[in-house]
A protein has these predicted regions:
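Hydrophobic alpha-helical transmembrane segments
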Residues: 7-12, 57, 85-90, 125-130, ...
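Nucleotide and nucleotide-moiety/phosphate-recognizing core
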Residues: 5, 9, 55-61, 66-101, ...
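N-terminal signal-anchor transmembrane alpha helix
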Residues: 2-29
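Interfacial segments of multi-pass membrane proteins
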Residues: 48-51, 74-78, 95, 109-139, ...
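C-terminal ends of transmembrane helices
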Residues: 22-27, 95-105, 132-139
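Alpha-helical transmembrane segments of multi-pass membrane proteins
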Residues: 13-18, 92-96, 132, 136, ...
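Short, non-helical or kinked segments that cap or interrupt transmembrane helices
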Residues: 32-43, 101-114, 141-149
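Cytosolic, membrane-interface loops and tails of multi-pass inner-membrane proteins
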Residues: 23-56
């Protein structure tokens, strides 16, 4: 695969990742700009704290789903080329964090990263979720659970023998 194809898959991922699900869903359902409330973040944690669980679950699913969709498109169009999928994944994550629709501002990438982990490394994502849940239940800090879960991802990717590019993605995502 040539360099232009990597750029293409990165761009596809970036556009999908740029969709500000939290902002648009909260605006559509509740008529408010979520960036004016709580932590001012558009992610599901701030949505949960500001407008409640139902909308937060929708935001979480959309943020996770947009990364998965970008990678699935790359997978189906390239016959499963791992590098195309990873470039789409990196694009989706960076698009979420630096959204085209929000002047290159965005979320923290936790839900989008989770969706990418679920698709690319299902065993790893399941264990990371259990670790995240245990930390959140024990401390009531979602951010701490997210950080510990993110730290576990590359360790588990290495342990389960995922290919080096997937391990590196887990390490930097």
């Amino acid at each position: 695969m040539d360099v232009m194809m990597f750029v293409l898959w990165f761009a596809v991922g970036f556009v999908f990742g740029s969709v500000p699900s939290g902002l648009w869903l909260v605006k559509a359902i509740h008529g408010i700009d979520i960036r004016e409330y709580g932590s001012k973040n558009i992610g599901s944690t701030n949505v949960f704290r500001t407008v409640g669980g139902k909308t937060a679950v929708l935001v979480l699913l959309c943020d996770a789903g947009k990364g998965i969709i970008a990678v699935m498109i790359a997978q189906s169009m390239t016959g499963g080329d791992l590098y195309a999928m990873l470039f789409a994944a990196i694009g989706a994550l960076l698009g979420h964090n630096y959204s085209l629709f929000l002047g290159f501002k965005g979320g923290r990438g936790v839900a989008t990263g989770l969706g990418l982990l679920i698709f690319l490394m299902p065993k790893v994502s399941g264990i990371c979720f259990i670790v995240w849940l245990a930390i959140v239940l024990a401390t009531r800090y979602v951010s701490l659970g997210s950080c510990v879960g993110a730290f576990c991802a590359p360790c588990l990717a290495w342990y389960f023998g995922y290919p080096l590019p997937v391990f590196l993605f887990a390490a930097v995502a």
